[in-house]
Every structure is written in structure tokens, then in C-alpha cells.
From Swiss-Prot:
Annotated PROSITE patterns: ATPASE_DELTA
Keywords tagged on the record: ATP synthesis, Cell membrane, CF(1), Hydrogen ion transport, Ion transport, Membrane, Transport
PANTHER family the UniProt entry points to: ATP SYNTHASE DELTA CHAIN
An annotated Gene Ontology molecular function: proton-transporting ATP synthase activity, rotational mechanism
Pfam families to which the protein is assigned, alphabetical: OSCP
GO CC, one annotated term: plasma membrane
Function: F(1)F(0) ATP synthase produces ATP from ADP in the presence of a proton or sodium gradient. F-type ATPases consist of two structural domains, F(1) containing the extramembraneous catalytic core and F(0) containing the membrane proton channel, linked together by a central stalk and a peripheral stalk. During catalysis, ATP synthesis in the catalytic domain of F(1) is coupled via a rotary mechanism of the central stalk subunits to proton translocation.
NCBIfam families: ATP_synt_delta
Annotated coiled-coil segments of the chain: none
Protein name (Swiss-Prot/TrEMBL): ATP synthase subunit delta
Length: 179
């Protein structure tokens, strides 16, 4: 069960610190990187949430992995380990990212793919969408095992599908029209 109050207050605190320290972009980038590390490496979260691992070992692990991270974010990670709240970090970071982006007037979106996109490809798609939508766009790449091929993008009210399901839908529509 997610502790919504803890998630909301922690995300708010992180985003407020980012603005107070005038490090919004740095926080955005680093929170996004850490979120992806945890998302794509669930064994890291399991290790840090384990009751059989000593707290000192968990802290040392965090300090070694994230030694180049902004100290304020590192302290937040260490506090989450101390308070046994690691399992909430994914939601906290997502909400903090969304809050910072909203204040910076950046539109958040999601691109669903069958495989993880490279950072270069994701940036290329973000740039094209930013030009098309006439606003800065930041995409989160999520893996959708139900997609057979292609992608789905959602940014606000804008949706684009280019996958096997959309091709089949188009063929069915074409057949119904008698084309």
C-alpha cells in the first residue's frame, strides 16, 4: 500500500528544495536518472529494502553508487534508507519531476515501447514533439509488453499510435469503408 501523504510531502519537499537552491534542471536530470536506475534494476530496490542487510551496508552502497549525485538528493536517499521508505522512491521521484516540470512549463509525456529507447533516440523524439506541439516536451519511456511492435506516445491531449494494433485498426476501418 502506498503511503500517499508520505509520497506527496516528500515530493513537495524535494521540488521546493530544487527551486530554493535554484537547481531545478539539475534535480530534474538526477531524479530522472535515479528513477530509471531503480525502475530498470529492481534488485537494487530489493537490496535496499531488505531487512537482512545492515543499515550501514545499505548507506555505503548508496554513497558508492551515487557518489557524483547532488548532495541534497544523496541525503534524501540516505534518509529514505534509514526510514525504510525505499519502496516509495519511484512515486516520490515521479511526483517531484512532474511538479518541477509543471513550474518550468515543461509538458510531460509517456512513450510506450517494446524495448527501452536509447537516450539519444528519446531526446530526438522529444525535440520533434517540442517543435510540433510548440512547447518543451519531456518523455518518460515505459516498456509495454503488450505492444507487438512500434510505439504509443501521449503528451497531454496529444496521442499518437504507430504499432501493430493501430495498423490493424486502420485496416479494419478501411475494409468497413469498402476501400
Amino acid at each position: 500500500m502506498i503511503d500517499n501523504h508520505y509520497v506527496q510531502s516528500s515530493a513537495k519537499a524535494l521540488s521546493q528544495i530544487a527551486f530554493e537552491e535554484k537547481k531545478e534542471k539539475l534535480f530534474l536530470n538526477q531524479l530522472f536518472i535515479i528513477k530509471n536506475i531503480f525502475s530498470y534494476n529492481p534488485e537494487v530496490v530489493e537490496y535496499l529494502a531488505s531487512g537482512s542487510i545492515k543499515l550501514e551496508n545499505k548507506k555505503k552502497f548508496i554513497e558508492e553508487i551515487f557518489d557524483l549525485i547532488e548532495p541534497l538528493i544523496l541525503n534524501f536517499l540516505l534518509m529514505a534508507v534509514e526510514d525504510n521508505k525505499i519502496k516509495y522512491l519511484d512515486n516520490i521521484f515521479l511526483k517531484a519531476i512532474l511538479t518541477i516540470n509543471k513550474k518550468l512549463n515543461i509538458e510531460n509525456g509517456i512513450i510506450y515501447t517494446t524495448l527501452k529507447l536509447s537516450d539519444k533516440k528519446l531526446l530526438e523524439i522529444e525535440k520533434k514533439l517540442s517543435v510540433f506541439l510548440k512547447k518543451e516536451v519531456k518523455l518518460l519511456n515505459l516498456i509495454d509488453k503488450e505492444l507487438i511492435s512500434g510505439y504509443e506516445i501521449q503528451v497531454g491531449d496529444f496521442k499518437q499510435r504507430n504499432n501493430v494494433a493501430s495498423w490493424i485498426d486502420q485496416m479494419a476501418l478501411s475494409i468497413k469503408k469498402g476501400d
